[in-house]
């Protein structure tokens, strides 16, 4: 072989060896870093790391979530949506010098981001969004190759390092929204110097000041979101240069002035939302935005007419203009060319008829035109709108009859036509309205009898028929409405008797049948309604005695005046002064304005009756004893059959008991409460430990069972409440959420076993006979703990868990008065955002804890429903009042009452619970401010629970221990900043 050829072969082999060695070194370094990363999450047992093994043969490039370049260097780590929690080892990961992409979004990572992040100098893509980090985001000037930066919704706080953006001139996406950063005095100038930006998301991150004219220099922008901020001043005319924009979000700021001239140049705009500002002028600049799909301009001060061109937009499906000063008619062509989905033009000065074609293409879900001056009748076309879910046209000047088919639309959830001039009947078509949750028909001229078919609308929760011309009997089928909470029938011409079946409406809280011609006796079944809060049967022709069963109710309002009642006023009801006037046949031993009841023992004839009653009573007692012995025998047989039944137990935590220990203790004497979806029992185990057992009731087959029947009775399958509660609680691990130990099921019964909380509920502590004198520090700790529990539900998962029935009776207290969120029978896990979260046909919850306008403007149940309910709980803690009190007035709740007492500092102090010490009253007012923010009328204005927790932490009272240290600490922080 020639020397030159030998030299070439040697050089070739040496080069190959050298390259292979270098490859091995780089891959080995990267491998060690990745294995260290894996070890950081060793306790999590996550499937994503199963492939991250030392002996995988190919090296780190084969790991799931890892990408390498052609030289074998790790360039990308994508662990988004992988269930990661805890601290992430940024210090070691940033040793990978070739790393260009780090994607960790949609996890539960926590802790403070270390300054080591600046060592990831090759990063082009960084996604830390939707996590649970804390503290400030570190300075990142060295990351000068960044093109994509996602930090949104990750709980960062403090001062954001805006100056670091000066080196990030290649940024295409900047997403910092939904973080409680320290407020800026002005709009950050560093942002408007990023000329390559196509996506800018700065919503809800404490940006303040005016929108700078230089925003017009970002001509590549396609998405601009700066909503939920402190922006002021006018929208600069330079914004018209952003001709590539397809989405512009400016809502919930304090912007003023008119839409700038040239705004119509943004012809690519598809989504525009400038709602909840102080904008004025007309909407004429929008007439040329023909590509609009969604236009949201509600809650401003716009005036003038709605452009006729809106009726010609072919893609417009969502139009929200409510709470402005718009005049003229709605464009009659609205929806005729588009797949119209939603319109809300409520609370304006609109006139003319309702456009007939908004459901022409059969896609419309909501028609909301309440509080205007509309005239004419409801177009017949809407009786065929099978997709319609909400129909609200109250407080207008509409007339005519309601199209028959409208009553029975299959997806309709709410009909609100009150305060108009409608005539005619409710037709039998209503039987087809299986999703119908609310009927608001008050103050019209509707007439005829209520159809018996109204009982077939299984989902009805609110029926308001007041101030109409209805006649005839109240249909007995009303007892089939198991979810009915409010029944208002006052000021009509109803006659006949109140049906006994009303006692089957176990969720009723408000009944008003005043000013009718109802006769007969008051049904004793009304006394079996556990949640009844207000009962008004005044101005009728009722006769007979007042049922003793009413004594068991805890009513804030009772009015039986102006009837034909007779007999004794039950002693326990005598405190309802004025509730019995106009009934000359009534007598009382305690109310002076009534005749004194005659003592039966004074009459010889009555004495005979008295003796007969005793004899008769003894006979009943004897018969009861025989029946009791028979039941005992039956229960033993039942117990023996349960023993041999096939049970399945599914545990979620370490347990020291068996299913037999639980089943043997489900007895009447262990019953401690009835929840929204089941009965609760206290069970003492053999080792002395106590647990709570909930026996879930089937919603679909729920019946009224007597206490004499077997407790674990046959069921038709598993209830949806049981499945919901198990699904929700089995995976939850949080200090402030009640612990679920296991579920126990058979073909016939469903049981859930929880930790037992000995101090009952917050409601008990504040309002019941068990109420305790809670100090402010304890109330504060309860508020903070409950808020953290809800925050975990809303933000601790990839998809939020919505409780849907937050109230003080569902906040349980342990032996140290630490709170736990409980009763998840109504909970809902929001579905993936593809197509939006599922809507629900009825806003679940409890009267007094639900926003009055939730039906009006909330198209779906969201986390903001829980936020409102929690705000009501905070008001209970501060004021000591129940959500509904007689002193608030007719149709008023605690939110109205608090709002009406905000006129001065003195009036605010007056509503703070007198049991709260003087030194803490200012702290209580701080909490009241948070409650007011939480109970904002519009869901969009309510904070997230994450923000609520932060606000409550900021409102921590100065405690007597360590007060000097705390003050010094505060001073030091201020000096450092």
From Swiss-Prot:
Residues 1-28 form the signal peptide. The keyword Transmembrane applies. The keyword Cell wall biogenesis/degradation does not apply. Glycans are attached at residues 73, 119, 152, 167, 204, 252, 268, 318, 373, 399, 536, 577. It holds the Pfam family Pkinase. It is found in: Membrane. Residues 666-959 form the Protein kinase domain. It comes from the Eukaryota. ATP binds at residues 672-680, 694. This is Receptor-like protein kinase 7. The chain crosses the membrane at residues 609-629. It comes from Arabidopsis thaliana (Mouse-ear cress). Belongs to the protein kinase superfamily. Ser/Thr protein kinase family. One of its GO terms (biological process) is innate immune response. It is an enzyme of class 2 (transferase). It catalyses: L-seryl-[protein] + ATP = O-phospho-L-seryl-[protein] + ADP + H(+); L-threonyl-[protein] + ATP = O-phospho-L-threonyl-[protein] + ADP + H(+). Plays a role in pattern-triggered immunity (PTI) signaling induced by pathogen-associated molecular patterns (PAMPs). Acts as a receptor for PIP1 defense peptide. PIP1 is an endogenous secreted peptide that acts as elicitor of immune response and positive regulator of defense response. Involved in the control of seed germination speed, in tolerance to oxidative stress and in maintaining seed longevity. It is a single-pass membrane protein. Disruption phenotype: Slightly delayed seed germination.
């Amino acid at each position: 072989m020639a020397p030159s050829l030998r030299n070439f072969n040697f050089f070739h082999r040496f080069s190959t060896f050298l390259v292979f060695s270098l490859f091995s070194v780089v891959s080995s370094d990267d491998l060690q870093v990745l294995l260290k990363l894996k070890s950081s999450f060793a306790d999590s047992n996550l499937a994503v790391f199963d492939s991250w093994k030392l002996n995988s043969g190919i090296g780190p490039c084969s790991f799931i979530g890892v990408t390498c370049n052609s030289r074998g260097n790790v360039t990308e780590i994508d662990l988004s949506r992988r269930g990661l929690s805890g601290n992430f080892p940024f210090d070691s990961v940033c040793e990978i010098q070739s790393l260009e992409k780090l994607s960790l979004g949609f996890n539960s990572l926590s802790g403070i981001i270390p300054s080591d992040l600046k060592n990831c100098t090759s990063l082009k893509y960084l996604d830390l969004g939707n996590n649970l980090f804390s503290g400030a985001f570190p300075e990142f000037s060295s990351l000068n190759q960044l093109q994509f930066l996602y930090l949104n919704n990750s709980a960062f706080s403090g001062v954001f390092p805006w100056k670091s953006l000066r080196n990030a001139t290649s940024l295409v996406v900047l997403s910092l929204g939904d973080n409680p950063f320290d407020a800026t005095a002005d709009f950050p100038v560093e942002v408007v110097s990023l000329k390559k930006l196509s996506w800018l998301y700065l919503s809800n991150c404490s940006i303040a000041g005016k929108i700078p004219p230089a925003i017009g220099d970002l001509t590549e922008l396609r998405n601009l979101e700066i909503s939920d901020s402190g922006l002021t001043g006018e929208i600069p005319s330079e914004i018209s240069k952003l001709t590539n924009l397809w989405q512009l979000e400016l809502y919930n700021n304090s912007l003023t002035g008119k839409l700038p001239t040239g705004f119509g140049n943004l012809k690519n705009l598809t989504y525009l939302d400038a709602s909840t500002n102080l904008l004025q002028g007309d909407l004429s600049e929008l007439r040329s935005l023909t590509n609009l799909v969604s236009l949201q301009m509600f809650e401003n001060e716009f005036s003038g007419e709605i452009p006729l061109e809106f009726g010609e937009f072919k893609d417009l499906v969502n139009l929200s203009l409510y709470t402005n000063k718009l005049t003229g008619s709605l464009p009659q062509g609205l929806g005729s060319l588009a797949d119209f989905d939603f319109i809300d033009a409520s609370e304006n000065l609109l006139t003319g008829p309702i456009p007939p074609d908004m459901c022409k293409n059969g896609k419309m879900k909501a028609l909301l035109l309440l509080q205007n001056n509309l005239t004419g009748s409801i177009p017949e076309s809407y009786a065929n709108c099978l997709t319609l879910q909400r129909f609200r046209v109250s407080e207008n000047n509409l007339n005519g009859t309601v199209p028959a088919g409208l009553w029975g639309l299959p997806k309709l959830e709410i009909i609100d036509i009150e305060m108009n001039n409608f005539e005619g009947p409710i037709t039998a078509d209503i039987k087809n309205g299986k999703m119908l949750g609310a009927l608001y028909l008050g103050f019209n001229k509707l007439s005829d009898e209520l159809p018996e078919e109204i009982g077939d609308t299984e989902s009805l929760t609110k029926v308001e028929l007041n101030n109409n011309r209805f006649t005839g009997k109240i249909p007995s089928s009303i007892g089939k409405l198991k979810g009915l909470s409010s029944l208002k029938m006052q000021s009509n011409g109803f006659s006949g008797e109140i049906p006994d079946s009303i006692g089957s409406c176990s969720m009723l809280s408000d009944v008003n049948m005043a000013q009718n011609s109802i006769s007969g006796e008051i049904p004793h079944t009304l006394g079996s309604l556990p949640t009844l809060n207000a009962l008004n049967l005044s101005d009728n022709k009722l006769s007979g005695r007042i049922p003793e069963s009413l004594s068991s109710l805890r009513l804030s309002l009772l009015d039986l005046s102006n009837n034909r009642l007779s007999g004794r006023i039950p002693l326990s009801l005598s405190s309802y002064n004025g509730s019995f006037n106009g009934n000359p046949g009534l007598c009382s031993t305690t109310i002076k304005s009534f005749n004194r009841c005659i003592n039966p023992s004074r009459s010889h004839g009555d004495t005979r009756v008295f003796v007969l009653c005793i004899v008769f009573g003894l006979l009943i007692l004897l018969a009861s004893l025989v029946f009791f012995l028979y039941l005992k025998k039956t229960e033993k047989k039942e117990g023996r059959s349960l023993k041999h039944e096939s049970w399945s137990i599914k545990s979620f935590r370490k347990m020291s008991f068996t299913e037999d220990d639980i089943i043997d203790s489900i007895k009447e004497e262990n019953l401690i409460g009835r929840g929204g979806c089941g009965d609760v029992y206290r069970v003492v185990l053999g080792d002395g430990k106590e647990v709570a057992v909930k026996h879930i009731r089937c919603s679909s087959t729920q019946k009224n069972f007597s206490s004499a029947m077997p407790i674990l009775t046959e069921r038709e399958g598993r209830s949806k409440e049981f499945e919901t509660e198990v699904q929700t609680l089995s995976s939850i691990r949080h200090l402030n959420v009640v612990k679920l130990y296991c579920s126990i099921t058979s073909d016939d019964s469903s049981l859930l076993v929880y930790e037992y909380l000995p101090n009952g509920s917050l409601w008990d502590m504040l309002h019941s006979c068990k109420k305790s004198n809670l100090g402010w520090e304890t109330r504060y700790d309860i508020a903070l703990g409950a808020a953290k529990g809800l925050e975990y539900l809303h933000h601790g998962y990839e998809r939020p868990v919505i409780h849907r029935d937050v109230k003080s009776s569902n906040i349980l207290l342990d032996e140290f008065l630490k709170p736990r969120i409980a009763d998840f029978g109504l909970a809902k896990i929001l579905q993936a955002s593809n197509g939006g979260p599922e809507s629900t046909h009825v806003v679940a919850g409890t009267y007094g804890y639900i926003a009055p306008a939730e039906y009006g403007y909330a198209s779906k149940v969201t986390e903001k429903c829980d936020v409102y309910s929690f705000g009501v709980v905070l008001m209970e803690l501060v004021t000591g009042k129940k959500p509904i009190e007689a002193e608030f007035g007719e149709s008023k709740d605690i939110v109205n009452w608090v709002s009406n007492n905000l006129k001065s500092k003195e009036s605010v102090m007056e509503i703070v619970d007198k049991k709260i010490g003087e030194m803490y009253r200012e702290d209580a007012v701080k909490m009241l401010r948070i409650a007011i923010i939480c109970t904002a009328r519009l869901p969009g204005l309510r904070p997230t629970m994450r923000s609520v927790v932060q606000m409550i932490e900021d409102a921590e009272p100065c405690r007597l221990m360590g007060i000097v240290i705390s003050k010094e600490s505060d001073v030091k922080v201020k000096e450092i900043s």
